[in-house]
């Protein structure tokens, strides 16, 4: 875009505060504080900068919960970031964002992912180009219509002040992005996804990103509070591990954030904290017709209008 005026310091302050707010809320819900791992890359390394990882493993509610903040810079955008905008290939960059994935212990609690980020591409003698990206999406093992509707309504409410066209646009983008092409199935019930967003200018784009970040806790926590105490057994845990396998497949094969981190020389522990602690694969497994497991495929991981 032509307007190159932006304020990285304000974005950084917001993102660090968002990470802290979410980590505190999850720790209070679980009863276990999230550990803090602050990391830094040296000026001579391929990727410079640092960040903070907040992590919980083996909790009462969350089997694994990871929330990462990073602010890194490099000399050339990796291919995953410039594939859709080849004119940016080879530019230097700064990328800062918060990304989280939560894997609850109870199979009736859905996995969730959220990310908000800003990227700046630079080239000597030319104005910097910035954009925002992010979104959130819900991946149930056992679907509940109330949960999907609540999650989508909260996403819509976060976007509506910035234009009624944004929710349907970002919802469709999410359905198309979180799709396992080799399985011909969606990863979950979707949510919202956006990238390369800078159309309204810095201030309005930043406000929209903040609205998405601020909507995460009200979108997700009520679902966990409804489902975390539901009884479950070995059958449900087995299906949870099987569905987590799909999560692994998507993140390692398709996810642009994972590819960006690995291609740019990012911190592997932070990049792969999105992986579930336990996952499995079964050869040519099919759910029993009419079962709750079959309903996930027929009623939930298909494109639907949830609002």
From Swiss-Prot:
Substrate binds at residues 99, 115-117, 265-267. The record marks 182 as: Important for dimerization. Residues 247-282 are annotated as: Important for dimerization. It is found in: Cytoplasm. Its cofactor is a divalent metal cation. One of its GO terms (biological process) is protoporphyrinogen IX biosynthetic process. It is an enzyme of class 1 (oxidoreductase). Its EC number is 1.3.3.3. Pathway: Porphyrin-containing compound metabolism; protoporphyrin-IX biosynthesis; protoporphyrinogen-IX from coproporphyrinogen-III (O2 route): step 1/1. GO terms for cellular component: cytoplasm. Disulfide bonds: none annotated. One of its GO terms (molecular function) is coproporphyrinogen oxidase activity. InterPro entries: Coprogen_oxidase_aer (IPR001260), Coprogen_oxidase_aer_sf (IPR036406), Coprogen_oxidase_CS (IPR018375). The active site is at residue 113. It catalyses: coproporphyrinogen III + O2 + 2 H(+) = protoporphyrinogen IX + 2 CO2 + 2 H2O. A divalent metal cation binds at residues 103, 113, 152, 182. Keywords: Cytoplasm, Heme biosynthesis, Metal-binding, Oxidoreductase, Porphyrin biosynthesis. Involved in the heme biosynthesis. Catalyzes the aerobic oxidative decarboxylation of propionate groups of rings A and B of coproporphyrinogen-III to yield the vinyl groups in protoporphyrinogen-IX. Homodimer. Belongs to the aerobic coproporphyrinogen-III oxidase family. This is Oxygen-dependent coproporphyrinogen-III oxidase. It comes from Burkholderia multivorans (strain ATCC 17616 / 249). The gene is hemF.
């Amino acid at each position: 875009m032509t307007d190159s005026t932006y304020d990285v310091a304000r974005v950084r302050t917001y993102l660090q505060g968002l990470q802290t707010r979410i980590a505190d809320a999850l720790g209070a819900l679980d009863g276990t504080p999230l550990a803090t791992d602050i990391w830094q890359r040296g000026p001579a390394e391929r990727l410079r900068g640092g960040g903070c990882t907040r992590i919980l493993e083996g909790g009462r509610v969350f089997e694994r919960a990871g929330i990462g903040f990073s602010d890194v810079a490099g000399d050339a955008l990796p291919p995953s970031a410039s594939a859709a905008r080849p004119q940016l290939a080879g530019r230097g960059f700064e990328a800062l964002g918060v990304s989280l994935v939560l894997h609850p212990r109870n199979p009736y609690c859905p996995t969730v992912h959220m990310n908000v980020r800003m990227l700046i591409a630079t080239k000597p003698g030319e104005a910097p180009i910035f954009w925002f990206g992010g979104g959130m999406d819900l991946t149930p093992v056992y679907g509940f219509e109330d949960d999907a509707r609540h999650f989508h309504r909260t996403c819509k409410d976060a976007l509506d002040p910035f234009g009624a066209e944004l929710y349907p646009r970002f919802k469709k983008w999410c359905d198309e992005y979180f799709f396992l092409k080799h399985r011909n199935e969606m990863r979950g019930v979707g949510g919202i996804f956006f990238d390369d967003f800078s159309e309204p200018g810095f201030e309005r784009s930043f406000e929209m990103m903040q609205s998405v970040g601020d909507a995460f806790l009200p979108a997700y926590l009520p679902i966990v509070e409804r489902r975390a105490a539901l009884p479950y057994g070995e059958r449900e845990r087995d299906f949870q591990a099987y569905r987590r396998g799909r999560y692994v497949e998507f993140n390692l094969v398709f996810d642009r954030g994972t590819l960006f981190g690995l291609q740019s020389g990012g911190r592997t522990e932070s990049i792969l904290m999105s992986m579930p602690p336990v996952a499995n694969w079964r050869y040519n497994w099919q759910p029993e017709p009419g079962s709750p497991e079959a309903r996930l495929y027929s009623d939930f991981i298909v494109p639907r209008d949830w609002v």
